Design a protein with these regions (language model features):
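Histidine/acidic residue-rich metal-binding segments in metalloenzymes
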Residues: 67-166, 188-209, 253-257
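Active-site loop ensemble at the mouth of alpha/beta enzyme cores that anchors a bound cofactor
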Residues: 168-188
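N-terminal small/glycine-rich loop or linker at the start of catalytic domains
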Residues: 40-59, 110-111
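Alpha-helical scaffold segments that flank or form the walls of functional sites
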Residues: 1-38, 61-85, 115
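Active-site mouth loops of central-metabolism enzymes
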Residues: 1-2, 53-71, 123-125, 185-187
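His/Asp/Glu-enriched, well-ordered alpha-helical/loop segment
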Residues: 119, 182, 192-259
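Short, electropositive alpha-helical surface patch
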Residues: 30-39, 101-107, 111, 136-150, ...
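Active-site environment of divalent metal-dependent phosphoester hydrolases
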Residues: 24-28, 50-52, 90-94, 129-135, ...
Length: 259
């Protein structure tokens, strides 16, 4: 019933394509089977893949060595996964400026994981935060970077150079700004870094796509994606509204092609 409720929320919001980020319970596979009833094309990696002891348990399964990673990639294929989702870093620490939880994967590991997924015929969605981690992911050839907080000009130019699709999920922070859950000053600082990152990415012609990270605290299914589009419009200004609409349409087209 809950999955149907979420699908109905997407339908009500006029959304016809949903790409989830994995889960350990099989919910995405069930949602994909039900989605056509709601006029929705649904894509799932079945489960996300993370290194044991690092962030990612909430959305998937862990590997301890290379053999285990390759086994998980094969399991995604056998389960009918539409793509591979890898977790290369932790998440934002909303109480500390500029801090990402969990040690990032090494550059060599990200390259190898991405290549193995592509060799299996599957595109790669990468959960990434931090400028160096974004550069590693883009240069490794991941197909999309999710979140991508705390970037700099070098990492943004790197995404542009490699035609990496960036899904910034700004709404995960903007929806927290006034609810008192985390320190207001820190949230405002994080949001400011997101604004600057989006503005620079827009200037550098990074391929942008709207995504909400729905299910995160304060981000509702269906409504979240419209809030993401709205906050992007506010950040870039009314004068860039039409161009942003074109860019997001192009980004969605590329997402649909790759995933």
């Amino acid at each position: 019933d809950l999955i149907r409720e979420h699908l109905a929320a997407y339908q009500k919001a006029g959304i016809s394509y949903v790409r989830d980020g994995g889960d350990p319970y099989g919910a995405g596979v069930l949602a994909r089977s039900l989605a056509p009833e709601y006029g929705i094309t649904y894509r799932t990696p079945v489960f996300a893949i993370h290194r044991a002891g690092r962030y990612g348990k909430i959305v998937g399964r862990a590997f301890s060595d290379w053999k285990e990673y390759c086994t998980l990639v094969r399991e995604v294929r056998r389960a009918g996964g539409d793509f591979i989702k890898i977790m290369t870093t932790g998440i934002l620490d909303f109480a500390t400026k500029g801090h990402v939880t969990s040690e990032p994967l090494s550059r060599e590991e990200v390259f190898a994981m991405t290549a193995a997924a592509h060799d299996a015929g599957l595109s790669v969605m990468a959960h990434v935060n931090g400028a160096q981690a974004v550069m590693d992911a883009a240069e490794a050839g991941v197909d999309s970077v999710e979140h991508g907080n705390f970037q700099n000009e070098e990492s943004i130019c790197c995404m542009a150079e490699h035609a990496t699709i960036w899904v910034p999920t700004i709404v995960t922070v903007s929806n927290l700004l006034e609810n008192g859950r985390y320190p207001a000053e820190t949230l405002a600082w994080i949001f400011e870094t997101q604004k600057k990152g989006l503005q620079l990415a827009f200037e550098k012609d990074v391929v942008l796509a709207a995504g909400s990270d729905a299910g995160a605290y304060g981000v509702l299914h269906g409504k979240g994606i419209r809030e993401e589009e709205s906050v992007m419009r506010k950040i870039l200004g009314a004068e860039n509204g039409q161009e942003l609409e074109k860019r997001l349409a192009f980004g969605e087209k590329k997402i649909r092609e790759k995933f």
